[in-house]
Amino acid sequence: MGRTGHCVVFIDLHTLFGIGDRRPGRATQKIQPLELAPGVWQMGLITFMLLGSFMIAFTSNAVNLTDGLDGLAGGTLLIAAFAMMVLTWISASQRASYFLMVPYVPGSGELMVIAGAMAGACLGFLWFNVAPAQIFMGDTGSLAMGGLLATIAVCVRQEALLVLIGGVFYLEALSVIMQVGWFKFTRIRFGEGRRILLCAPAHHHFQQAGWKETQVVGRFYLIAITLAIVALVSLKLR
């Protein structure tokens, strides 16, 4: 995301938490719906804003990098959105959040509607996006959907589980970072750039290794489903 994107993320968080609004009761009214249950550790507001901004920006770009094969980004987003819908329901329920020892976030049940709408949109989109694709998500769709997914996770205080739920996206992004970083390092160190993968992002590496496009997409779906299940099951295993 460019400078404008980061400004938008900061403004959203600024508005969400009422920073700078010193009218009596105003800031409290904005923060109160997102406060955690007593006894739950909270990081400082500035740290939280920096972490939240980073998570939203990084996830947005990670989804954008994943959108390289027909049906890949749409399907993995569908899985992640469904898992996030479950998390928002748990966070909104005082009994469920206490039982599973996750932060209780009053009012977060409204986000379940957004996560459900996101999953439904991905499902309808995927019908026309599977190979051979008739429509494409593009940068506008992938950046927005990735940012929305991360925003929901930040609002319900599940940034850590987002790393599992969106594991495919982060692996794709890390593959690009590692490939570019290693290439630049070896070019400076040895005078010749070297690569870790055959091609980046990771889905193109497997294509170069001989996998068919449908094989890559299908297996990434399986990985995404597995990670989503592990993330949800881990709530009970704490």
Regions flagged by a language model, labelled:
Residues 30-41:
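A short, charged helix-loop
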Residues 26:
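Charge-lined substrate channels and their catalytic hotspots, especially those that engage the 3′ end
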Residues 1-20, 29, 44-238:
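Alpha-helical transmembrane segments
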